[in-house]
Amino acid sequence: MRIGHGYDVHKFGGEGPIIIGGVRIPYEQGLLAHSDGDVVLHAVTDAILGAVAMGDIGTLFPDTDPAYKGADSRVLLREAFSRVMAKGYRIGNLDVTIIAQAPKMLPHTPQMRVNIAEDLHCHVDDINVKATTTEKLGFVGRKEGIACEAVVLLIKESLS
């Protein structure tokens, strides 16, 4: 078994909507990023890569490479996870915490779970996505951006 932790943050800017967990969410602003700015999938990608000591999303998909400009983070997650599966690992469980003052995430978390489970080839019951605020404190509380943390347990498949 291997445990990984991922963290990502993006600043609000430009026009909405935003994409979080592969879900398009209406909002007055977008998230500034080289790719689509999906903080959930970026944190998840970092967690799975970190669990198997394969670096992070920025190493695998550098923001200096124009090929990833505006990239769909679901595509990036699938590519990263294919490398993790090639090492013989599968998802045990994944726990995601979105830290955002706005917009409200609860209506969207069920679809986020479905998207992530599909991308990671696991059951939706292995995926948890929840959201919290910072009680109006800090950059998140001032609605300047969104952050996300992810913790994953990977299980090595037996070669029987």
Swiss-Prot record:
This is 2-C-methyl-D-erythritol 2,4-cyclodiphosphate synthase. Pathway: Isoprenoid biosynthesis; isopentenyl diphosphate biosynthesis via DXP pathway; isopentenyl diphosphate from 1-deoxy-D-xylulose 5-phosphate: step 4/6. The keyword NAD does not apply. It comes from the Bacteria. GO terms for molecular function: 2-C-methyl-D-erythritol 2,4-cyclodiphosphate synthase activity; metal ion binding. InterPro entries: MECDP_synthase, MECDP_synthase_CS, MECDP_synthase_sf. The keyword Metal-binding applies. Involved in the biosynthesis of isopentenyl diphosphate (IPP) and dimethylallyl diphosphate (DMAPP), two major building blocks of isoprenoid compounds. Catalyzes the conversion of 4-diphosphocytidyl-2-C-methyl-D-erythritol 2-phosphate (CDP-ME2P) to 2-C-methyl-D-erythritol 2,4-cyclodiphosphate (ME-CPP) with a corresponding release of cytidine 5-monophosphate (CMP). It comes from Proteus mirabilis (strain HI4320).
